[in-house]
Regions:
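Acidic, glycine-rich A-domain
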Residues: 1-205
Length: 205
């Protein structure tokens, strides 16, 4: 989203690189994606607002998915791409984040993987948002999507970047407020989970 610009996108970059470095020597296959909305044609929003019967939906805007790292791709081959995360978010598309539909897409990709254990970590700096959409409906959609993935065996973790909004949506969550929190709150805990350990609920923010 637009609010991820500045310090928050830098923190996300550092978090991704630190986690990838921690997992590089292991057998864990890591993929890194980003998502935001593509610009919404005004005619679409006008038609939606004018419609007498507003059918429930999770989004109006098309979703852009950025591929920063593929499963099994060595970090040295994609470090530059991850470093360009801020530029890609600034130069392409709109400014909103449709979390529910986006993590559902990532979940479908995970379900195609051969690994028995499937973990989805979501970095977020706030609430789902899209042009013309009901915020309560979008929040409820995200909760439903998370529960749906968990029901299919996917472990879903929320990482709040300078926000505790993740508490509303993710059973397993933590908050990173500054770069000093990265190693303690994210890298150590998530790398432990990904190599087969358990989530330390006592430390969850």
């Amino acid at each position: 989203s637009g609010s991820m610009d500045g310090d928050r996108i830098v923190m996300a970059q550092k978090a991704v690189i630190a986690l990838a470095e921690a997992l590089e020597p292991t057998q864990v296959k890591l993929s890194v994606k980003g998502f935001k909305t593509k610009g919404l044609p005004r005619s679409w929003e006008k038609d939606y607002r004018k419609s007498r019967v507003k059918k429930p939906c999770s989004s109006l805007s098309p979703i852009l998915i950025f591929n920063y790292k593929d499963f099994g791709q060595p970090l040295h081959r994609c470090r530059e791409v991850i470093g360009g995360m801020r530029k890609s978010f600034r130069n392409v598309g709109g400014y909103h984040n449709i979390d529910g539909a986006s993590i559902a897409l990532m979940g479908e990709e995970l379900m195609k993987r051969p690994e028995k254990r499937k973990v989805l970590m979501v970095l977020s700096d706030g609430l789902p948002e899209d042009t013309g959409m009901n915020k309560r409906q979008m929040n409820a959609d995200l909760v439903d999507r998370v529960l749906g993935l968990e029901a299919r065996g996917v472990e879903v973790f929320g990482v709040g970047i300078q926000t505790d909004a993740v508490k509303q949506f993710y059973r397993w969550h933590t908050v990173v407020n500054d770069t000093s929190d990265l190693e303690k709150e994210l890298v150590d805990r998530m790398s432990n989970v990904l190599i087969g350990g358990a989530w330390d609920a006592r430390k969850a923010s």
